[in-house]
Curated annotation (Swiss-Prot):
GO CC annotations, alphabetized: CKM complex; mediator complex
Protein name (record): Mediator of RNA polymerase II transcription subunit 12
Encoding gene per record: SRB8
Keywords of the record: Activator, Nucleus, Repressor, Transcription, Transcription regulation
Protein species of origin: Saccharomyces cerevisiae (strain ATCC 204508 / S288c) (Baker's yeast)
Functional summary from the UniProt entry: Component of the SRB8-11 complex. The SRB8-11 complex is a regulatory module of the Mediator complex which is itself involved in regulation of basal and activated RNA polymerase II-dependent transcription. The SRB8-11 complex may be involved in the transcriptional repression of a subset of genes regulated by Mediator. It may inhibit the association of the Mediator complex with RNA polymerase II to form the holoenzyme complex. The SRB8-11 complex phosphorylates the C-terminal domain (CTD) of the largest subunit of RNA polymerase II RPB1 at serines 2 and 5.
GO BP: any one term: negative regulation of transcription by RNA polymerase II
Family: Belongs to the Mediator complex subunit 12 family.
PANTHER family: MEDIATOR OF RNA POLYMERASE II TRANSCRIPTION SUBUNIT 12
Principal subcellular localization: nucleus
Length: 1427
């Protein structure tokens, strides 16, 4: 309309009217999208907008623009968007039409579609055809009419990636070749049988999949072949990139078998050991991740999830295990690159590669953790121990907002794996309920056994004790502490183990091991236990030991010297502090109590601790406080007196007056001050060479007189790094020291790599030319073997050290072989040893050299001057040359020498210490009886000879012949019993047994010998047991090597042995029952009581009828439990039983007593300690039975029915009462799990026989429904129910006698409706009901049981496949369905639209799918909900 100003005022439409269904024609539809009907409204629009025109301020500088451009943007300006939308339309069209699917061989889509023909071409023309195919400039219509012969599977795929054929053309070629091959196979088979086409298709699909897999493997492994050629490497990168795209397209088009490919990919990565291929393999895995893990993005919406849920996919479980294993391998590996040109010192590059790989692995593991069922994280026990810390590390480092849910999942997984292990201790549950850091120490004495005393703790880890008793040099303690953090109870147990008298002789490293483990615990990431808490616990232990110090409790007095040494080591490392101890001592008020003897123990302890000058006043103040009770402490041991004594000892050392320092009564604090001064003195000033005499002299001062190994090893590092050793003899002496104290070598030497490299350098480069004769006859092979055996990890880290060790090892072998095969070399070495320049070929005489030098060595053992020392060494080298030349001949002469017996026992000990004779050779000639006489003998001049090698060789011989030696001692004791004999074989037997018998490797032999001693004289068995226990708590002052226990050793307490097997005490054997000895059982002598238990049980079983034996055995077991106050060691006393029938009988006895107690005390709570001991006994015996027989103990019928009654009673209780019986429920479920197979078989058998077993299952289900106060118990019950369901389904499919049923087994619905393992089933909050459940409430619970089992159904909305909706962005709602109608050409739609116009139809669905109106309305496909 003209408004008078020459302009038209046009009112544009408020909005574009959406398309509406044809059922509502009355609604306004915008023009240009529907034929006009010439209504009044349309005529008005025509008059206003078209006939009269439209005018508006132009948007550009010309006025010829159409009005349409203002309303709808032109296609030119929206070309990019239009092309994107059109591309999406074409993609959807290609997904449904115009394609050749691999899973359908009958529908070749499209009118007139026809496969190209195969023709025979020459190689040149075939190559030309392939080049044209790879060129995008050549029309596919031109070359696609035929395909050359000879292109099959591998050739097709190889040509595709070698010539980089465009992907669309490559897919066309592969599809054509695939279907041509299918048609050929179909014609050959000519089978009309049902399923024949499918069989052909599956076989063909497998062949093509194998071809893809073969080429992919080849391309991956070709990567390492192109490292040195950058051009080939670039080509390879293009090829692998292209092939992965081709593989992905063929995978999406189902031209390969997905299942076969998935399994291959997982297995391929799992078996891959080379880290260089891992990144690419993980990249390929991530490409196909969704399909492998069954993540379906197009899954239909499920309103409810019932039992039809997918079971955990096998590949997901396997890939989870594979990824965690790879994470473990990569994280523990030091080097990630195998390239020879790679320098291992490039730590930065190595760490970057390692972190990137770990990041990829952790991201994939997190995806599984967040998206998959938790069943995939259920692992075997061995794997779970490795994966558990890794899984915690990955989850804790995850950057996610759902930390609480992640922790719940992790907790659930951990509980489930722990429940499957069946070894979670109920005692730990009880300990966690109380203060886990509180420990109780009791020194037990008994009037019936006045000589005996033992140390008992409220919590003992017996496996930890076994580990400490074994303690191999190569054991990885850092990893152990990282995986098993030391609790306060373990720390106290560790300290008591290290200072216990029975562990002093064979565990010289115990004190240093304590310091090492405490430092590892303090520096660990676990902050549950702080350093100050550890120090408080140590001083608390010291106060408790001081409180129990008395003449009756001898074990404490014998522990004090070792306690002094341990505390000083801890002070050196800063773990504990003396000022803290003084403050605690003063604040305790013990110093001011007149009747307390504790103060004297504390003062004696303080005198032996390292005191710095800054603490002088505090130290003297403590001594003054006890002057009114004992003046000598202050007069003799005040700080000034300590300094004065220290200076006196220094002067004696400087004057070389060290023959007899007599420092056994000197306080350890003085020794430490002297040691620190002496170490500083040796390492300062002018450096001088060190020979064997000086080395052994300093060893005696530090390790024997001053009792400080730590300072001596510091000095060893100093002389090695400064290359101060003067000759091969001194280096050999150092080797003997390191081998003798090899466990200290691993702890005191800071850098094993540098030390060993320097040691090898001194041996090969410095002393080899300097001391040629000794080099040729001295073997260092034991040290090389020791290092390679005990430090394999070091050799992996440092390849140079490994090469050097291998080289020196081969040199040793070649040196020996040269002397054996080359007589001239022997004569040359012999001349150098004897300083003779003339040829001695005619004077070399093996017997003469042997006799002369052996005689000289035996008659000149006392080295007086330097000349004698040189002659002595020359004689030894001559004999060593004989050994290196012909060992077999040398042993013959030595055998003749031994048979003549023209020597004393000390002469033999001298030869053994000089490495000229071994215990093995002596045993072969003179017998083991003679060897036993030699064992107590040691060198008199131990400080200046080869006594250290004698000690080392003696220990090795005893351990390797442990059983033979003890049996021989036993037989000799019987032989000479009652006769006068200068050697006490019984005492030797006890010394060896106590010293080495607690080692786990020798425990079986120890049990055998103890039982032999007890069986030999049943009447005196009590005396024998007392002797063994006495030796283990109050040993003699020296061991078989005359090594003293240390300063502070009481003088008046020595070993008293019952040589005549009689007891001088007032009691007789009949007065003491064997059970009463168990009151003296502790963690240190547990191995003795294990043997004693075997003896007692054997005696019970042999002397009674079966019925009476069971009753006596029951009384024996529960008397032990009673007399030990339910000690946690009771469950371990049966560990050495060998008879499986006896183990099964004991298990049934203990189970019956427990079940009977539960039924009799239904209204009362059973003692928790009793439950714990009973279950630990059953657990220990069941696991032992399973290890030995690979089966499980079958539950007796009586115990089975008792178990049914107990579960029924528990199911009737309300949740409040159940929570009070948590320990009892746990015990019942553990018994159920131990006999799970036999119980399930009984249940299935009863169900098949129509016996009333369903109530039993209902009771378990009801109990599960009521328990919500403890996640661990709920998981335990769920595990039982799911296992029962699986067992029932499995047994119904197996036709075996064990599963044979007479009829069909019908399981209760509650069991059948058991859903898969879900987090929501166990993490939901459940309100605790008060009061008893009524009948109606119980009925409701039974009805809703299936819902409560599989709770937490999370409804996830998915978009329906092939369903699209048109969404109105302004109204925010869906207006209609977007129809998909396959078509071949866009002209088809024009034809259909013309037909609709002709018929007068108002259907606009055809245009609804056109690309034109999509672009006009800015429409697009989106796989998401716009809400």
């Amino acid at each position: 309309m003209n408004n008078g100003s020459g302009r038209y005022l046009l009112t544009p439409p408020d909005d574009l009217h959406p398309y509406v269904p044809s059922s509502k024609p009355q609604e306004q539809v915008y023009p240009d999208f529907k034929p006009w009907e010439h209504t009044a409204a349309e005529d008005q629009i025509l008059a206003n907008f078209v006939a009269k025109g439209f005018y508006h301020t132009p948007m550009v500088n010309f006025e010829s623009i159409s009005a349409r451009s203002s309303v709808h943007e032109s296609l030119v300006t929206q070309s990019n968007i239009l092309s994107q939308q059109f591309d999406k339309i074409i993609k959807i069209r290609e997904d449904h039409i115009n394609k050749i699917p691999s899973n359908s061989t009958t529908t070749l889509h499209g009118p007139g579609f026809q496969l190209p023909n195969r023709i025979t071409l020459t190689d040149h023309r075939k190559e030309t055809w392939l080049h044209e195919l790879s060129s995008s400039h050549t029309s596919l219509v031109k070359i696609g009419k035929f395909i050359p012969h000879g292109l099959k599977r591998r050739q097709v795929i190889e040509q595709c990636y070698l010539k980089f054929i465009p992907l669309k053309r490559a897919i066309w070629l592969i599809k054509c070749c695939y279907f041509i091959e299918w048609k050929s196979n179909h014609k050959k088979k000519r089978s009309n049988a049902a399923g024949a086409d499918d069989a052909i298709s599956m076989h063909l699909l497998k062949d093509w999949t194998d071809t893809f897999v073969y080429i992919l493997e080849k391309l991956i492994f070709d990567m390492t072949n192109h490292y040195n050629d950058s051009q080939q490497l670039r080509t390879w990168k293009r090829q692998i990139s292209y092939f992965l795209k081709l593989l992905g397209n063929c995978y999406s088009l189902r031209l390969i078998n997905k299942e076969i490919f998935h399994h291959w990919l997982v297995e391929f990565i799992n078996k891959m050991e080379n880290f260089e291929f891992l990144p690419l393999s993980l990249h390929i895995l991530m490409i196909f991740w969704n399909d492998i893990c069954q993540i379906d993005t197009n899954a239909p919406v499920a309103a409810t999830i019932t039992s039809s849920q997918k079971e955990p996919f096998f590949l997901v479980t396997k890939i989870t295990d594979m990824l965690l294993h790879k994470y473990y391998i990569v994280s523990s590996s030091k080097s990630m690159i195998n390239d020879e040109n790679y320098i291992i010192n490039d730590i930065k590059k190595n760490n970057k590669i390692k972190l990137n790989i770990l990041k990829i692995l952790s991201s994939l593991i997190l995806k599984i953790f967040q998206e998959q069922s938790l069943e995939v994280f259920i692992f075997p026990t061995s794997n779970w121990e490795i994966y558990k810390p890794l899984l915690f590390e990955i989850v804790s480092n995850a950057d996610t907002n759902q930390n609480s849910d992640m922790k719940k999942k992790l907790e659930l997984i951990s509980y489930r794996n722990e429940s499957l292990k069946n070894n979670s201790s109920i005692r730990n549950v009880i300990m966690s309920a109380s203060n886990a850091n509180d420990f109780q120490l009791t020194i037990v004495t008994c009037k019936q056994f006045p000589k005996l005393s033992c140390i008992q703790l409220n919590c003992i880890d017996t496996q930890f004790t076994k580990l400490l008793d074994d303690n191999p040099t190569e054991f990885d303690w850092p990893t152990y502490v990282d995986q098993n953090p030391l609790t306060m109870h373990k720390i106290i147990q560790l300290i008591l183990w290290s200072i216990h008298p029975s562990r002093q002789f064979d565990h010289y490293e115990s004190n240093q091991l304590v310091a090492k483990l405490l430092l590892l615990r303090i520096n660990s990431t676990d902050e549950d236990l702080h350093e100050f808490q550890i120090e408080d616990a140590i001083w608390s232990l010291v106060f408790q030991l001081a409180k129990n110090f008395s003449a009756q409790k001898r074990v404490v007095s014998y522990m004090m010297p070792s306690l002094y040494r341990l505390l000083n080591i801890l002070i050196t490392y800063g773990i504990i502090k003396v000022p803290t101890y003084i403050r605690k001592l003063i604040s305790s008020g013990l110093l001011y109590l007149q009747d307390s003897n504790d103060k004297f123990v504390h003062v004696q302890l303080l005198i032996n601790l390292k005191i710095s000058p800054l603490m002088k006043s505090q130290y003297n103040m403590v001594l003054r406080n006890v002057m009114e009770y004992d003046v000598k402490f202050y007069e003799i041991f005040n700080f000034d007196q300590l300094v004065e004594i220290t200076e006196q000892i220094k002067m004696r050392i400087l004057s070389n007056d060290i023959t007899n320092l007599q420092l056994s009564k000197t306080p350890l604090s003085i020794k430490i001050m002297v040691a620190e001064w002496y170490l500083s003195h040796l390492c300062s000033g002018i450096l001088s060479s060190v020979n064997r005499t000086v080395l052994l002299k300093i060893f005696k001062i530090f390790c024997i007189d001053l009792e400080v190994f730590h300072h001596f090893f510091k000095w060893i590092e100093f002389i090695v790094y400064h290359q101060l050793l003067s000759d091969i003899e001194s280096l050999e002496a150092l080797m003997d020291i390191l081998l003798c104290y090899q466990k200290l070598f691993s702890q005191f030497i800071n850098d094993h790599i540098l030390f060993t490299k320097t040691f090898i350098f001194i041996y090969k480069k410095v002393l080899k030319e300097k001391d040629v004769p000794a080099y040729n006859v001295t073997s260092f092979m034991p040290f090389w073997k020791f290092f390679m055996k005990n430090f394999p990890f070091v050799l992996k880290v440092d390849n140079d050290l490994r090469i050097e060790l291998q080289s020196v090892y081969n040199d040793e072998k070649l040196k020996t072989e040269k002397l054996k095969n080359d007589k001239s070399e022997v004569l040359k070495v012999y001349s150098m040893i004897n300083n003779s320049n003339q040829a001695v070929g005619q004077t070399w005489n093996f017997p003469e050299v042997f006799q002369v030098n052996i005689r000289f060595l035996l008659h000149n053992s006392e080295i007086i001057d330097t000349n004698t020392s040189k002659q002595f060494q020359k004689a030894r080298n001559n004999v060593m040359l004989l050994i290196a030349t012909n060992l077999k001949e040398y042993n013959k002469f030595m055998s003749i020498f031994l048979k003549r017996k023209d020597f004393t026992n000390k002469n033999l000990i001298q030869l053994i210490s000089l490495k000229l004779l071994t215990f093995e050779v002596t045993q072969n000639v003179l017998g083991l009886e003679y060897i036993i006489r030699l064992l107590p003998i040691n060198l008199e001049n131990n400080d200046g000879s080869y006594g250290l090698f004698l000690k080392y060789h003696k220990e090795q011989f005893i351990k390797s012949n442990f059983e033979k030696i003890l049996l021989t001692c036993y037989e000799l004791e019987k032989k000479y019993h009652g006769n006068e004999c200068e050697i006490n074989y019984y005492e030797i037997l006890l010394k060896i047994l106590i010293t080495y018998g607690s080692s786990p490797k020798l425990l079986a032999t120890s049990t055998k010998i103890i039982m032999l001693l007890l069986n030999d004289s049943v009447e005196n068995s009590s005396n024998i047991l007392e002797d063994i226990l006495y030796y283990s708590t109050c040993p003699s002052e020296t061991d078989l090597n005359d090594i003293p226990l240390g300063s502070g050793q009481p003088d008046n307490d020595t070993v008293v042995t019952n040589d005549d097997k009689s007891d001088d005490d007032d009691h007789t054997v009949d007065e003491i029952d064997h059970v009463e000895y168990y009151v003296m059982m502790d963690f240190a002598n547990l191995w003795v009581f294990q043997a004693f238990t075997c003896f007692c049980i054997k005696k019970i079983m042999e002397n009674n009828e079966p019925a009476m034996a069971m009753e006596d055995l029951k009384n024996f077991i529960f008397q032990i439990i009673e007399i030990t106050n339910s000690n946690d060691l009771c469950s371990q006393i049966f560990d050495q039983l060998k008879d499986m029938q006896t183990i099964e009988m004991i298990t049934q006895i203990v189970e019956k007593d427990f079940c009977t107690s539960c039924l009799q005390n239904n209204n009362q709570k059973i003692d928790d300690n009793y439950i714990v001991v009973v279950i630990e006994i059953i657990t220990s015996l069941s696991m032992r039975f399973q290890r030995e027989t690979s089966g499980m103990i079958v539950i007796s019928m009586e115990n089975y029915h008792l178990l049914i009654k107990i579960i029924r009673q528990l199911s009737e209780l309300n949740e409040g009462n159940l929570s009070k019986r948590e320990i009892q429920i746990d015990a019942v479920l553990k018994i159920f799990s131990f006999h799970q197979d036999s119980i399930f078989q009984r249940i299935i058998a009863d169900l098949s026989a129509d016996k009333p077993t369903s109530p039993f299952i209902d009771s378990i289900c009801k109990l599960f429904d009521k328990i919500s106060f403890n996640l661990r118990l709920k998981l335990f019950l769920y595990e039982i129910l799911s296992s029962l369901k699986s067992f029932a389904i499995y047994s119904s499919t197996i036709d075996a006698p064990a599963f044979h049923t007479s009829g069909k087994v019908e399981l209760p619905k509650k069991l059948l409706n058991l859903p898969p393992f879900q987090v929501s089933s166990f993490v939901k909050e459940t309100k605790l009901h008060s009061g008893d459940y009524g009948e109606e409430e119980d009925a409701d619970q039974e009805e809703s049981f299936s819902l409560n089992l599989g709770i937490g159904i999370v409804e996830i909305a998915h978009e329906n496949e092939q369903k699209w909706l048109i969404y109105d962005k302004k109204d925010h709602k869906y207006v209609c369905t977007f129809s998909m109608e396959p078509y071949h050409f866009i002209s088809n739609y024009n034809t259909k639209y013309t037909d609709d116009m002709a018929t007068g139809s108002n259907d606009t669905t055809a245009f609804n799918d056109s690309c034109v109106n999509l672009s006009l309305f800015d429409a697009r496909f989106e796989r998401k909900n716009p809400h």
